[in-house]
Amino acid sequence: MGLDFTLVADAEDLVAGVDEVGRGPLCGAVVTAAVILDPTRPILGLNDSKKLTEARREKLFDEICEKALSWCIARAEVEEIDELNILHATMLAMQRAVEGLSVTPKLAMIDGNRCPKLAMPAEAVVKGDSKVPAIAAASILAKVSRDREMAAFELIYPGYGIGGHKGYPTPVHLEALARLGPTPIHRRSFAPVRQAYEAREALGEIQS
């Protein structure tokens, strides 16, 4: 069952929903999205991306891109995560997503308990991807986009299982990291990766 569109602000107000995917993984970018929905073109079945099947997310991804008034997918790269830390990199990526919208919203509703610095008012909504349709839509765009990227990395860096765990610190990933060493897409600032780098640097076996 999808979210109720009566939960959003009045249709005359342009509200952007903003969400992120990829704060916890050991590798890859953190990906964000901002979406302004069109009240005259409702999208049925919007919900927190984690509560939807992959097939449903893929279908909704295309529908959101087609029907939304405006949408933007943005990111902060591994190098930025390592330089800034994951929280600040996430805020930067959210800022980029909102700034990339072709329409300027009157309000940005951010999933979570922190808001990035924006040119318009912002409101943090804890578990917003389960409450606010625009945030749910943003969560779907961000997750599908990042999952596709992880599937591509699976082919570039075989043996790590990236396409399955999406970079999260699962036992499979940690074992592969210890056995194969880190790749260029791993986040050096995260402890398991840093430890793997130190071990491999001692042996001169860092991948390039």
From Swiss-Prot:
CDD domains: RNase_HII_bacteria_HII_like. Its EC number is 3.1.26.4. GO terms for biological process: DNA replication, removal of RNA primer; mismatch repair. Keywords: Cytoplasm, Endonuclease, Hydrolase, Manganese, Metal-binding, Nuclease. Its cofactor is Mn(2+); Mg(2+). It is found in: Cytoplasm. The keyword Oxidoreductase does not apply. PROSITE patterns: RNASE_H_2. Residues 13-202 form the RNase H type-2 domain. It is an enzyme of class 3 (hydrolase). Its main location: cytoplasm. GO terms for molecular function: manganese ion binding; RNA binding; RNA-DNA hybrid ribonuclease activity. One of its GO terms (cellular component) is cytoplasm. It comes from the Bacteria. A divalent metal cation binds at residues 19-20, 111. Manganese or magnesium. Binds 1 divalent metal ion per monomer in the absence of substrate. May bind a second metal ion after substrate binding. Endonuclease that specifically degrades the RNA of RNA-DNA hybrids. PANTHER family: RIBONUCLEASE H2 SUBUNIT A (PTHR10954), RIBONUCLEASE HII (PTHR10954:SF18). This is Ribonuclease HII. It comes from Pseudomonas fluorescens (strain ATCC BAA-477 / NRRL B-23932 / Pf-5).
